[in-house]
C-alpha cells in the first residue's frame, strides 16, 4: 500500500508579476469533461475563442488563436515563423525580456540590432524611429510591458513608423494583455503575443497570439505540410518553399488546424483551451475599459501605501506599468529575508528582480484576479509588519491609511 497522499497545495496570496491567482471560475471549467479535438463541440469552442481573442486584442485580424505552451512558446512561434537567416531585426531593450527577444532571434539566424536604454526608463519613440530608418530592418520586435523593471512603452508612433518603412512590428504583450490597453489595429502592430498567467488569471500553458495579413503572407511563403499527412496537391504547390525551421512552432501548419481545414498538427491542450476561453470571457464580461480602470485603481492604492510607509518606488513614474509596482529595498535590509518571512508568516508572495536590479528591488503585481482591494491591504499590512521585524526605519501605521484614503476618495467621486 502506497504511503503517498493526494496532492494538497497551500493557500497563497500571490502578488507577483506572474503567475497570479487563478480565477475560481477558470479552475471550475478546467474540471469539465475532455472531448476530442475534432469533435464539433470542441471546434465550436475553438471558433468562439478566436472571436473573443480578436476583441481582447482589439483587432479584426483573421488569425487570433493560442499556441500550446508558455508565453515564451508564443513569442518563439511568431519569431520562428517570420525570421530567416540573415534577416535584420531591430530590438529596443529596456529590461530582461527585451534580451529574451534577442536570444530567440539570434538562434533563428537573424542579424540582431540592439538598442538599449537604462533599466527603469523607456525610450523616446523618436530614438527608435531614427534607428528604424537607419537599419531598415525586416522586423522590429519589442516588449510592451517590461515586468523586470515595471515600465510600459508607448507603441503607436513606432507602429506607424514600421508601417511607413515596411518593417514588421512584433510586440510582446504578455504582461499587459487583459490589464492594460493593447490596440493591435490602431497601433499598427503586425503581430502580438499575450500571456495567460498574468492579467488573464489563467494558468500558464497557452499563449494567445494574433497577426495580420502582412505576417500571414510571410508565413505563407514558407508553408509546408508534414509528409505523413500532405496531399499530392500540397506537395506540388509547396515544393519550392523554404520551410519554417521549427515544426512545433510552424504557424503555417497551425493555421491549417485553426482554419476550416482542421488538419492535424499536435494534440490540442483541451483543458487549457477551456481555461483560456473562460478567462477571456471574464475579461470581456467585465468590459475592457472597466477592467483597465480596476487595475489602475488598485495600483494607485498600493503605491500610496508604499510611499506612506517611507519606501521609494523604483523607476521613471511617467512610464510606470499599472499592473506592476517596483519598490526599492531599503539600505541594510536583506530583500530575500523579507520575501521569505512574508511567505512563511503571511502566505504572501512578492517577487525579486533580475540582472542589474537583483537584490535592489521588490516587484509587486496587481494583475487580474489578484488585483483586489483585500489583497492590496493585506500585502501592505504584511510588508509593514515584516519590515518592522527587520528593524527597517519605516513609518509604521501609515500605509493602510493611505491606501484606504485612495479607496474612500474613489468611492466619494463615484457617488457624485
UniProtKB/Swiss-Prot annotation:
Give the first-level EC class, as a single word: transferase
Residue list for modification N6-(pyridoxal phosphate)lysine: 198
Q: Say if the entry is tagged with keyword Transferase.
A: yes
Checking PROSITE patterns in the record gives: AA_TRANSFER_CLASS_5
Instruction: Tell me which InterPro entries the record gives.
Output: Aminotrans_V_dom, Aminotrans_V_PyrdxlP_BS, PyrdxlP-dep_Trfase, PyrdxlP-dep_Trfase_major, PyrdxlP-dep_Trfase_small, SP_NH2Trfase/AEP_transaminase
Q: Which GO terms describe its biological process?
A: allantoin catabolic process; glycine biosynthetic process, by transamination of glyoxylate; purine nucleobase metabolic process
For this chain, one GO molecular function annotation is:
L-serine-pyruvate transaminase activity
State what induces this protein.
Expression is very low in excess nitrogen (glutamate plus ammonia) and is induced during limiting-nitrogen conditions (glutamate). Expression is further induced when allantoin is added during limiting-nitrogen conditions.
Its annotated pathway reads:
Nitrogen metabolism; (S)-allantoin degradation
Entries under Pfam families matching the protein:
Aminotran_5
The catalysed reaction is: (S)-2-ureidoglycine + glyoxylate = N-carbamoyl-2-oxoglycine + glycine
What does the UniProt entry list as the effect of changing residue 264 to S?
9-fold decrease in transamination activity
Question: Which key words are in the record?
Answer: Aminotransferase, Purine metabolism, Pyridoxal phosphate, Transferase
Whether Calcium counts among this entry's keywords is no
Q: Which cofactor does it need?
A: pyridoxal 5'-phosphate
Q: What is its EC number?
A: 2.6.1.112
Q: How does it assemble?
A: Homodimer.
Function as written in the Swiss-Prot or TrEMBL entry: Catalyzes the transamination between an unstable intermediate ((S)-ureidoglycine) and the end product of purine catabolism (glyoxylate) to yield oxalurate and glycine. Glyoxylate is the preferred substrate, but other amino-group acceptors can be used.
Q: Which family does it belong to?
A: Belongs to the class-V pyridoxal-phosphate-dependent aminotransferase family.
Name listed for the protein in its UniProt record: (S)-ureidoglycine--glyoxylate transaminase
Q: What is the lineage of its organism?
A: Bacteria, Bacillati, Bacillota, Bacilli, Bacillales
